[in-house]
């Protein structure tokens, strides 16, 4: 067998008849499979042991030789070699065909490869191959032409006229002869000459033919090999036949298809031997051709061959295609040993890096380890007795299991794994029961809840795997989200509520203004009921453990609450004392106004201070981010555990409940509604008088009711009591929001009908009051659409992620610096006046391309190739700089990847990205994972043509697939001035742009809103009307940079509108993959063919070569490919074939004799090598691990 890790590339090509015979271990002559009496394979049949090897290890067919000592002996009675049975998985056979047949992939594919080589139409080919017409193979000196088709009648007539002077025949034999006669070199030269003169369709056809002929010439494949003389038979274990309970047999469809081929082949041989009339022989040959077609690709031509119950049989092609095919089912996703799955329940007492593993599950997963340990400790004499001990679950087994499990991380995975945080490592602790315990803080990353979710457990076996799991994948290491670099482990729900309740301040609470000497005394007072958690009190500063107080402050009193004293205990001592939820308190220090001199009137001071809001979810997130920035991972994960415990404890103590009485209906709701109704009646009156159009009336009514709802919402939130449980839930960010509350107590507001148009009758009732029947009915539309959308969205979003992963899977950080001198000009992304992404967000974690200087002082803020961190970014923005040149993946010169400098900081770790990081896949996951949060709807606000702009997920797909957008905008192709805007017929408008040399006129579609005015100066690529730009058009009139920028901005716009933040660099990586190819226009003196798509790097290499020789370089135009197209155009045929259109990709690759260099991740997974990313990169693979035992307490210290 091949050593998987030792080959460098993989070739694919056409197999010659001799090659097929050399693979084979014998000819399959009979269609029989198994003898139904003895259940032994028939000799010379499809399962023959002499050809394919023995069915049982070390045992021949007749039983003369048994046992391993006869290894390699060929039995003299039955001819079977004594060897392992698993050779039946690799030994092939063959069938000698009595007549050549065509391979359907090459004759039927689009474009037909056979047709291009012979310059015949696929229709003509089909007529010849399936015996409907004759083709002239040698016209000799008759007026007939080579490759001319003749019907039966014409053929007879010409035979009578010319006798045997000319040769014409039908079937694959005729095509075989034509293919053998082709002189590739001569044809290629003729085509190259033709290209110089031809135009239009002839040129396109010539380019296609040239491509195929060049492919044959360069790859060493012979065109005649597209016709098969001999058919390979795949190993029997890959098309098994198994006996079912009732004595019946279940068999693979391939056996049926092979059987038909063999039957027809044998019948044809017999007919030929008998010298049957040609019409019978021809019919049999046609049937043989159809049988082989069905075997290779059933259903590609004509009606598929069906089995019992009219089910089409699965052919060889179907075995590779689709989700259930070989590629996606068995090569890219395998089931693995040492794994299990179970329901998850919450484990609030676990540490960040722990999970609870049910005892019986752990025992089964770690069985081999436990057995080894039992023998080593002398608790069992040998492995067999150790196994027996485990199966009987004897008490000493548990102690051994405990010791084995310590230090051995396991991986937990929850499907669907949308991003890399869907698999994390934990240290297992044994728990009773049968459910896996999961730490509450990692739920966000897994998107898990405990309503019956299940998770899978996997055990990393080797020392290297365990080390990687512990160092890279431990849950305590994965605190930041790779998509935006923000903490992903922020507390949620109960934890938020507990900390919110704890940090509340209530005026006039019991014991207000008391002074304590230290925290302990305050707690004692609280426990004895003298003060409340929410009471504002004063504490001597010098007794607090916090190290950030100044000497001056240490001699004062601090005004705070008992709850905040408790809250600050969980923060590191060198972190500012948190007394108010502000940015300055988190980043700098506790504000001065909370400090009082000894002897001051504390009660008076407290009365004069306004109430500070409690700590909400967002503030907790900021505290975590700041702690991570200052103290890194270990300290952060310990702090998170303390915050979690505090949250749970105090949300329990708060005892927050929700009752009907908590939902208070607004008093002046009726007045607001009546006022709105009055306005609506007014609008209706205007409409009836013909003062406004139907469209305007609708718009106004909608806006009146929206305003009414907003008024109610505002008043509601104001009228609520601070300690109303529902208000606390929504205000803290634990659950629900203002809109939910408005629907409960205010009014439901406007609803959309099934078409997405807003119904102008609002729902005036709230849930608390109860809806009328009509209101209830109207509500069901929206609810149902929501559920349907969600179901569709999940599938769409998953497919988007899959396409994104496929297009970027080979983008890996390959080197430290690519040495490019280009970059991009980063400025804030805006939409009108609204800022979508601020400049500092775009700069953080990027390398500067040019030095950044202060506009006034000229001081250099950031040097060239220096990393811009948070502080530098803020400094740049405060200096009033609005645009900065930065390094970007767009302009990186590294082939098959990006360099460290152009990529910048790794968002998942907050440090420099490592060489070997698979940034392409991380980018794809970061864009795909929030896909489910995007809306599906195309918003119709009243159906104005200009407003039907796609948003949400469909817009993202439109952008990444580079489709023509809906509601397309017109763009200017030249620089110039808008000379005039004229109304032409049917409300259409004509815009005339006057350039320096020429003028262009554009017709704006009916009703489109213009974005330019007369006399305005515009540049090429500028939008003239409202709508989305077609990026392909934009690329034609401008340059790559403009298109890259446009796509980046548009993608960010969609995500930010939905409140999802994604790092620019992820979108950059994806867009870069879409703009990798160049379409060759003129080949110059290079080897490349005009009209072909080439990778930019191959294109520049080819040009470099000819320029050095002083010849003419090729010219090309950059092409924007959608992600599906880009995936299929990748250099790796394995990756492309496993993505989509498997047969087309393989057909093409085989003809070109493609060579897969195994650079990407997918190719290596398919052939079973380590992926060439991360620790699998060659420069890291040479490192050998040295085992040093150290206890996990040092990794993440115990509490």
Swiss-Prot record:
Which positions bind Zn(2+) 2? Answer: 818, 892, 899, 902
Question: For Zn(2+) 1, which residues are the binding ones?
Answer: 60, 62, 75, 78
Cofactor descriptive note: Binds 1 Mg(2+) ion per subunit. Binds 2 Zn(2+) ions per subunit.
Q: Which reactions does this protein catalyse?
A: RNA(n) + a ribonucleoside 5'-triphosphate = RNA(n+1) + diphosphate
State the UniProt keywords alphabetically: DNA-directed RNA polymerase, Magnesium, Metal-binding, Nucleotidyltransferase, Transcription, Transferase, Zinc
The family assignment reads: Belongs to the RNA polymerase beta' chain family.
Record's GO cellular component, any one?
A: DNA-directed RNA polymerase complex
Complex formation:
The RNAP catalytic core consists of 2 alpha, 1 beta, 1 beta' and 1 omega subunit. When a sigma factor is associated with the core the holoenzyme is formed, which can initiate transcription.
GO BP term, pick one: DNA-templated transcription
Stored Pfam families: RNA_pol_Rpb1_1, RNA_pol_Rpb1_2, RNA_pol_Rpb1_3, RNA_pol_Rpb1_4, RNA_pol_Rpb1_5
| Protein's name according to its UniProt entry | DNA-directed RNA polymerase subunit beta'
Supply the NCBIfam families for this chain.
rpoC_TIGR
E.C. code? 2.7.7.6
Q: What does this protein do?
A: DNA-dependent RNA polymerase catalyzes the transcription of DNA into RNA using the four ribonucleoside triphosphates as substrates.
Q: Which gene encodes it?
A: rpoC
InterPro entries for the chain: DNA-dir_RpoC_beta_prime, DNA-dir_RpoC_beta_prime_bact, RNA_pol_asu, RNA_pol_N, RNA_pol_Rpb1_1, RNA_pol_Rpb1_3, RNA_pol_Rpb1_3_sf, RNA_pol_Rpb1_4
Gene3D superfamilies for the chain = 1.10.132.30, 1.10.150.390, 1.10.1790.20, 1.10.40.90, 2.40.40.20, 2.40.50.100, RNA polymerase II, clamp domain, RNA polymerase Rpb1, domain 3
What GO terms are given for molecular function?
DNA binding; DNA-directed RNA polymerase activity; magnesium ion binding; zinc ion binding
Disulphide-bonded residues: none
- The residues that hold Mg(2+) are 449, 451, 453
What are the names of the required cofactors? Mg(2+); Zn(2+)
